[in-house]
Structures are given as C-alpha cells and as structure tokens.
C-alpha cells in the first residue's frame, strides 16, 4: 500500500520495525496533537482497540472530521469504542492481515511503479526527520546539563537494535523512541497502565523470561522510588540488567501538567507541592550499593553511551544515573 504507519499513542510495545521507511513514530497523547498528525489523510486503518489513547484532556476529537476509520480487532468490545468507524471487523490481527496482504499483492504488482515511488519518498522523509533530530541533539550536546533529547539519543545509540528495553522514563521516552532504529518488533516495552513502579521489576522479569539475556531498564527518578527492591532481586539472581535512572529531581510529567493549567492554585502561587524530589536529593548510587549493585553517575553527555555500553557488556546488574534538565 505504501501507507505511513503510526504507533499507538500509549503503547505496551512497538509492534512494527522502527527502521522501516514507512514507520513515522508513535502518536502523541493529546487529542488535538493526534488530530494534527492525522488531518492530511483520507482514511485510517486501526489495528487493535487502543490506538488513539489520550491522557491529558484537550478540546475536540483525536480523529478529524471527514476521515474514514476502518478498524480490525480480536476483541469486539474495542470496535467503535472511542471513535466512530465506517467498518469494524472482528478477527485475529495476524491471520487477517496475512489474508489481506495476499489480496493486495496483485493490486500492488499492477501499480509497482507508484508503490516504489511511495517507498522511496517515505525513505527520504524518514532520513530527513532523523537528520533534523540529530542536528537538534548536536546543538544541545555540549550544554552544562544533559537535556532529555540528548539523553534519549545517547541511550538509543548505546543500546543498539538488539538489546531489550523496558522504559518507564516519561521525560525521555519520546526522544528515545524517535531514535530507535531496529528491524525487531520485540525490542521496546512500556507500561500501558501508567502507574509508577512497573519498570524496574518488569526488567528483571524480562531478563528471566528471555533466558537471562541483557535488558536495559530506563526509569525516571520518581518511578525508581516505587520499586527499588528490584535492584536486590537482580543482584540476587545475577541478572544482566542495566538500570538507567534519568534524574531531573522532580515528578516532571505531573509538574508540567499542573503548570499547563493556568487557573490552578499551584500556578498562581508558583508552588508545586510534593513535585520536587530534593531536600534531601536521592543518592541512587548509595541506594544501589546497599542492594549489591555497582553504580556510577554520568554527568557529561559524551560519557552516556560508553557507560551504558560498558554496563551491558559487564554481564551483571548495574545502575547508571544520568542527571538531566527538566526540559
């Protein structure tokens, strides 16, 4: 078809190769921003039931008027649940797509030239998007404090295309996803439920579930406070999990949401109660050491990738703290 492919706005994983030229990226989590991404299209083919999850409220629908929605899901309860559809079909997604592809193949073959042109155009667009991201990260690379954009790029660069990632770091997850470049559909996992504390124990479970293979757990400092005992389990089981704590010393996503509400008492008083994780700051190196996990702090952006590469290569549980800016 040559159609662009978007991921769910709040994914449990990324079930499409991020290296594919038709991959655009995950949708945002606000309805108005999703609509902005989709407004150029005539139709959407939604696979599964939770493609357009919105987290923070904005006016209007995530699906712009005039766009036809076709939906395929294995669960009938998903169909038409959050937006009207022109056609909804119940069926196993893999089996259904296999049949659809066989039906599409002769149609694509008869339009081979147009299809090839679409693929080439998509590849050029993807290359341009990645180049813009790289340039933006380069511009911030030598700043006094590592920015979320730079941290996301350097983490993705160090991890590469084959190591499993368990992500629970809201400050950097969008940037990390933008730099992923893998043919795998199983590399990246995320907590769809949204509750804090999932990431570190999930990474331990992932490693156990894939024959004790290396896993990188990326976690925000706030989320890390909910289940740090996962460090002890990783040490006890001698699992090759590299825990990367991106530390902005605040519940950043909550603070930003509060700041976006101009009528809130917090904004009027410029006081965000219980949002700052300071006084005292958490000593993650001491916390890791208390549970038998070696740890290091990386202050310079240039040292992030080498530190993560060394952590993965060590074959033992380890923790890397990366102080980052709030924006």
What are these regions (language model features)?
Residues 15-26, 44-46, 133-141, 186-191, ...:
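Short, basic, glycine/proline-bearing loop/turn elements
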Residues 6-20, 181, 212:
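Conserved catalytic cysteine-centered active-site region
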Residues 1-11, 160-163:
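Redox- and metal-dependent alpha/beta enzyme cores, enriched for Fe-S-associated oxidoreductases
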Residues 11-121:
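Glycine-rich, acidic loop regions that bind phosphate or pyrophosphate groups
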Residues 123-207:
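Active-site diphosphate/adenylate-binding microenvironment
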